[in-house]
């Protein structure tokens, strides 16, 4: 239950001539940034009880498959995750498991692949995602440790370890897909911008109706918001959004026939 809050008071700022031009310049810059963001939103019925107790893992896997359909390959992906259970106030980045997601994406696009094989690959990918999630929530994710190593070197005035100068590391941290997921009873639209010029931001709101007869993990639907930069010709929010919707439909059909992953 939410506590009643007092009515907010309007704050009035006195802007002098010394900072007035800077404020106007910042407003124009912000408007130009907002004008460069392409947004595509849609609602989906979700996966129902077939999603299991952790639908977030299923959605993460589905988004990997959708990116593969849209661009023909997987990409570096991150989902900011709270570490409040072990490090209050801290976050880490959750990455999806690449190999099982790639195998699933290829099987779903193979007209000769049997549904039983597709379902087995889906289970493998979701289990791998759940395993990574538990690892990160326990404070054992690699991203925070690597960041700690970088900051320790900077604080000590030492050269950065070679791993941070390797082109592979730069590619692995070029997050073309940044994901945000939140559960709520009323349903909400989550918009976040891309992290890189040729990337996407994807927010997924899990609508969880407060019905005591619903099984654990039952989802009342999904609200998906996809963002991209209009200045990039390699990305289009509606294009990825259509791929996401198609993958949700494909996985929903598998789950209705074969049960939760």
Where are these regions (language model features)?
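Acyl-CoA-dependent O-acyltransferases
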Residues: 1-261
């Amino acid at each position: 239950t939410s506590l009643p809050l007092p009515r907010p008071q309007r704050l009035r700022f006195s802007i002098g001539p010394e900072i007035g031009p800077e404020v106007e310049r910042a407003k124009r810059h912000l408007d130009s940034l907002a004008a460069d963001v392409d947004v595509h939103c849609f609602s989906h019925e979700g996966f129902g009880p077939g999603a299991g107790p952790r639908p977030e893992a299923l959605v993460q896997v589905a988004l990997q498959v959708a990116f593969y359909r849209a661009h023909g390959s997987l990409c570096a992906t991150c989902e900011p995750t709270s570490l409040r259970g072990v490090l209050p106030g801290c976050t880490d980045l959750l990455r999806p498991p690449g190999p099982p997601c790639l195998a699933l994406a290829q099987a779903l696009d193979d007209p000769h692949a049997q549904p039983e094989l597709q379902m087995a690959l889906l289970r493998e990918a979701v289990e791998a995602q759940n395993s990574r999630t538990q690892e990160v929530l326990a404070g054992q994710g690699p991203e925070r440790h690597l960041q700690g190593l970088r900051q320790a070197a900077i604080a000590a005035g030492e050269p950065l370890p070679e791993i941070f100068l390797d082109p592979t590391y730069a590619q692995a941290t070029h997050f073309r897909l940044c994901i945000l997921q939140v559960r709520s009873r009323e349903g909400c639209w989550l918009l976040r911008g891309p992290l890189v010029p040729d990337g996407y931001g994807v927010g997924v709101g899990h609508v969880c109706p407060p019905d005591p007869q619903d099984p654990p993990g039952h989802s009342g639907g999904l609200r998906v918001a996809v963002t991209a930069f209009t200045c990039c010709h390699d990305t289009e929010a509606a294009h990825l959004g259509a791929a996401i919707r198609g993958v949700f439909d494909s996985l929903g059909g598998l789950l209705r026939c074969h049960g939760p992953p």
